[in-house]
Curated annotation (Swiss-Prot):
Enzyme class: ligase
NCBIfam families, per the entry: argG, PRK00509.1
Pathway: Amino-acid biosynthesis; L-arginine biosynthesis; L-arginine from L-ornithine and carbamoyl phosphate: step 2/3
Coiled coil: none
Complexes and interactors: Homotetramer.
InterPro entries per record: Arginosuc_syn_C (IPR048268), Arginosuc_syn_N (IPR048267), Arginosuc_synth (IPR001518), Arginosuc_synth_CS (IPR018223), Arginosuc_synth_type_1_subfam (IPR023434), AS_cat/multimer_dom_body (IPR024074), Rossmann-like_a/b/a_fold (IPR014729)
Entry's EC annotation: 6.3.4.5
Name of protein: Argininosuccinate synthase
Listed Gene3D superfamilies: Argininosuccinate synthetase, chain A, domain 2, HUPs, Single helix bin
Length: 399
């Protein structure tokens, strides 16, 4: 008896998920494999994917366009939270996983599958994100992870696929593992596993090398409504177009690259290369607008909220009660975060040079050092006396 009768497989068209199709059928006795590919802005990669899945042995190949949902329900929530994992990574790849898990569960329920499957390995983060997401949405579904159990190297996986008629889109001389969606790209493996190896320029597609960027700066005005980016240079755009256009503008100036050592969920350190031009600039601009419109205590408290939020996303806990509770808190803080932030793009830098909001709590009369200063200077001495009282008492008692 096989491990399942009908399986919905998360499908990317790459080596691992393509090999999963014959492996599930030949090794685990699965009768029917339905593949599901989520169109999250990968571009031309999804063109031949349906035909390839069928050639690999799938009985049906589904492609779901979820770009708008990806941006509005996942990316925009991360932006409102200022979510940067380990203060650097904007979670461009991680944000896609809970959405794919949701689509897998919906397809399994629609087609009467008793299991879902993915091609994640035992050392990666995505296995955790998929498994926990599926578990949270439908605990009755089995989760199959062939690549976690088959104990094959990448070369052996490619060879197994070739024996089963699976063509590989990756040349054996090109060892990089790449994931792409509308928000960005992640590149790992091969020579990049040496932390001292400089990434070759050819791995980058969304961002230009500094030497190839324009010699004049470009200014971009980013408009926000209640924490959500809605316009570029005064033009209101739909969510997908806004991300796409900003990716192009920002990447054209060499902004949006990350080269970092990150701590994976499973406890190992991994060297990762990321491109996320729009997402990085949007988080920076959003955080700046918050500084103009929110009180100091709310702004400071949100630093911790953003850190926790980023860890929940990274560790596969998108559908957790804590994340739901944090969403409610974040949404309340964003009621005032409406306005515009001006960003200067030039030679690998994105510098915020201006901001404005009808909800600004910045007071020029209080901040100025000019003649129209409205600050009561005489009040400072009394304030310092009260504020410093604990320090004074401590010093008196301990010196």
């Amino acid at each position: 008896m096989g491990r399942a009768d009908k399986v919905v497989l998360a499908y990317s068209g790459g080596v691992d998920t393509s090999v999963c199709i014959p492996y599930l059928k030949n090794e685990w006795g699965v009768k029917e494999v339905i593949t599901l590919a989520a169109d999250l802005g990968q571009g031309d990669e999804l063109g031949p994917i349906q035909a390839k899945a069928l050639r690999c042995g799938a009985v049906e190949s589904l492609v779901t366009n979820a770009q708008e949902e990806f941006v509005t329900e996942y990316a925009f929530r991360a932006i409102k939270a200022n979510a940067l994992y380990e203060n650097r990574y904007p979670l461009s790849t991680a944000l896609a996983r809970p959405l794919i898990a949701k689509l897998l569960v919906e397809a399994a329920e629609k087609y009467g599958a008793d299991a879902v499957a993915h091609g994640c390995t035992a050392k990666g983060n995505d296995q955790v994100r998929f498994d926990l997401g599926i578990l949270a949405l439908n605990p009755n579904l089995k989760v199959l992870a062939p690549a976690r159990e088959w104990n094959m190297s990448r070369e052996e996986t490619i060879a197994y696929g070739e024996r089963c008629g699976v063509e590989s889109p990756v040349k054996k001389s090109s060892p990089f593992s790449i994931d792409r969606n509308l928000l960005g790209r992640s590149i790992e493996a091969g020579p990049l596993e040496d932390p001292m190896t400089e990434p070759p320029e050819e791995i980058y597609l969304m961002t230009k090398a500094i030497a190839d960027t324009p010699d004049t700066p470009e200014y971009v005005d980013i408009g926000f409504e209640k924490g959500i980016p809605v316009s570029l240079n005064g033009q209101t755009l739909d969510p997908v177009s806004l991300i796409s256009q900003l990716n192009e503008k920002v990447g054209n100036h060499g902004v949006g690259r990350l080269d970092m050592i990150e701590n994976r969920v499973v406890g190992i350190k991994s060297r990762e290369i990321y491109e996320a031009p729009a997402l990085l600039v949007l988080i920076d601009a959003h955080r700046d607008l918050e500084s103009l419109t929110l009180t100091a205590d709310v702004t400071q408290y949100k630093h911790g909220v953003g850190d926790t939020y980023s860890q929940l996303i990274y560790r596969g806990l998108w559908y957790s009660p804590l994340k739901t509770a944090l969403d409610a808190l974040i949404d309340q803080t964003q009621e005032r975060v409406t306005g515009m932030v001006r960003v200067k793009l030039f030679k690998g830098n994105a510098v915020i040079v201006g901001r404005q909001s009808e909800n600004s709590i910045y007071s020029a009369n209080l901040s100025t050092y000019g003649s129209d200063d409205a600050f009561d200077h005489k009040a400072a001495e009394g304030f310092i006396y009260i504020w410093g009282l604990p320090t004074r008492v401590w010093a008196q008692k301990t010196k």
